[in-house]
Amino acid sequence: MTGSPPTLPPPPLLPRLVGIGSWAIFLALFLASAHFTNFSLQTLAQGIPDFFAFFGKMWPLDWRALPEIGQPLLETLQIAYLGTLFGGILAIPFIFLGSRNTTANPVVMWGVRGFLTLVRSVPDLLYAAICVGILSFGPLPGVVAIVIFTASVLAKLGSETVEAIDPGPLEALQAVGAGRIQQIVYGVVPQIAATMASYVLYIFEINVRASTVLGFVGAGGIGQLLRTYLSFFDYRSTAVLILIVFGVVLLIDAVSSYARSKLI
């Protein structure tokens, strides 16, 4: 017995329309972005010789710049360290006030979350520029900018970690009449301590990188020296500085990654 082969039913219309619409939006955003930013592969290709010529000016390296780099580099690390330390301390109350299972009032929770979102919407370089206008030039504006960045990011990550904990210990503490502070200290902190330490180490890595450019707006650190070298077209010293920063960041990244692998 023979007959026509069975045919599959056509796919639903709505998913197809959603797929076509998504690709259309993606293409429209790409074209609009390329147009308004003057993105051009031809211009990029024409700039490749200049790219290599620029890096060619960095050779041979001028190692006489090494004595000048030590102090600003140390200042950069100090900015990142202090900013991470004070930012971490400042984030603690926001972590618990912004977590659904540890805050006392939903209004407070949403208020804290909204405030943190608002703070995170401003980049750390802009905070540094604002702080330079208020506190004058030097590393202090850089520290303040890093504190604000660290507190806002750590509070966000921390509140999400708190909401993902096992509720059992909290419920047990509530059953025996423990207060909210006691619940946090004995029921929440032991569960999030390792993860939060890992976050702090990771944010310190980010802050070291961020601190290297804060000097461009006068907020201290090695960025000021980098700006000076570029202003005087001293590319050979610039190359030495970049190599030193690269090595330090790699070292911190390796140590931090090892420490975080032991924590989690």
Which residues make up each language-model segment?
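C-terminal transmembrane helix and the adjacent membrane-cytosol boundary/short C-terminal tail
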Residues: P12, V18-S22, A239-I264
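Generic hydrophobic transmembrane alpha-helix motif, especially the helices
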Residues: L116-T150
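Cytoplasmic-entry segments and transmembrane alpha-helices of multi-pass inner-membrane transporters
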Residues: F94-A128, L157-E160
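Membrane-cytosol interface at the C-terminal ends of specific transmembrane alpha-helices
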Residues: G138-V188, A194-I203, A254
